[in-house]
């Protein structure tokens, strides 16, 4: 039964965009490197390379690397540990009662920034900023409940999985770019040696077209991934609500961690988080007793 609960949390509508993102990129690689059909001999090296990158990204090494890139460090100050760790333990125990299949422990790291913020990384890491310490205990617990929701639904682990896939896909896109540069170089040499206008023209056209196509493909695929990330914010908010932190989380989102995508349709489509008003409204629809006015 536990495995079905785990699969149920992963295969949700909110993760549909992530799945489409993954399938589109894998489909592109297979189309480029297996143009005459997918055979075991052709696909096996690709699968092995992909599995290796995914295993590395899902390992503690991948989690540690992502935390390091985010600037997250181990908490050394005793006063910060005394303040935060008991609050996280309370929320974590509540989450374990609701989701017994969760990891057995959570690591807490800190980022030295003054704006209040927190985010989950991998399977068991939550990062907080210095600014979060300015919130009340109840508000910090509400933020923890949201981040624990990401861990419970394995959103951050899926992001690591996608990160490994991106590393794999980026390598192949780099190969494509190198091939394009080589072809451009050939056109350039032909144009120089023959003093041909058309050689230079085709070189410029091919280089520009290949760059634009790769950029468009990347942006198109990212639309689906960003959609999933925004939907998963609602899912984590709902998890916090079910743990009893709905009204407090709505207050934090409204007063301390207000976020709004930049103006414009495209910027909104590529935003990682929904507008704070939308998140507060969703919590109110769930039953959170919160009103700012």
Task: Give the ranges of each region predicted by the language model.
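Juxtamembrane "helix exit" motif at the C-terminal ends of alpha-helical transmembrane segments
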Residues: 25-40, 170-195
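Transmembrane alpha-helices and immediately adjacent membrane-cytoplasm interface residues
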Residues: 44-70, 213-225
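N-terminal low-structure segments adjacent to metalloprotease catalytic domains
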Residues: 1-55
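Active-site-proximal gating segments in proteases and membrane effectors
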Residues: 98-122, 221-231, 235, 240-293
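Post-HEXXH active-site segment of zinc metalloproteases
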Residues: 155-185, 250-259
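Metalloprotease/metallohydrolase-associated module, dominated by Zn2+-dependent proteases
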Residues: 2-3, 15, 180-251
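Membrane-interface, cytosolic juxtamembrane amphipathic helix immediately N-terminal to a transmembrane helix
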Residues: 1-16, 139-167, 232
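Peri-catalytic and regulatory segments of divalent metal-dependent proteins
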Residues: 57-148, 152-156
């Amino acid at each position: 039964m536990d495995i079905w609960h785990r699969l149920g949390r992963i295969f949700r509508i909110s993760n549909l965009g992530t799945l489409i993102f993954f399938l589109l990129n894998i489909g592109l690689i297979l189309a480029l490197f297996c143009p005459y059909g997918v055979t075991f001999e052709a696909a096996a090296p690709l699968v092995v390379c992909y599995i290796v990158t995914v295993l590395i990204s899902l390992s503690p090494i991948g989690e540690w690397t992502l935390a390091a890139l985010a600037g997250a460090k181990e908490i050394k100050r005793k006063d910060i540990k005394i303040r935060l760790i008991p609050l996280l333990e309370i929320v974590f125990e509540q989450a374990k009662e609701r989701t017994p299949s969760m990891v057995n422990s959570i690591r807490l790291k800190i980022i030295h920034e003054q704006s209040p913020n927190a985010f989950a990384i991998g399977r068991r890491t939550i990062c907080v900023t210095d600014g979060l310490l300015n919130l009340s205990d109840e508000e910090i617990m509400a933020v923890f409940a949201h981040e624990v929701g990401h861990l419970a639904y394995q959103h951050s682990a899926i992001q690591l999985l996608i990160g490994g896939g991106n590393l794999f896909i980026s390598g192949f896109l780099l190969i494509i770019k190198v091939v394009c540069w080589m072809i451009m170089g050939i056109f350039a040499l032909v144009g120089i040696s023959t003093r041909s206008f058309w050689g230079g023209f085709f070189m410029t056209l091919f280089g520009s077209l290949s760059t634009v196509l790769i950029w468009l493909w990347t942006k198109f695929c990212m639309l689906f991934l960003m959609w999933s990330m925004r939907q998963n914010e609602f899912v984590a908010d709902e998890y916090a609500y079910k743990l009893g932190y709905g009204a407090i989380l709505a207050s934090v989102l409204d007063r301390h961690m207000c976020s709004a995508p930049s103006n414009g349709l495209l910027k909104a489509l590529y935003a990682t988080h929904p507008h704070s008003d939308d998140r507060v409204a969703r919590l109110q629809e769930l039953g959170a007793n919160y009103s700012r006015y």
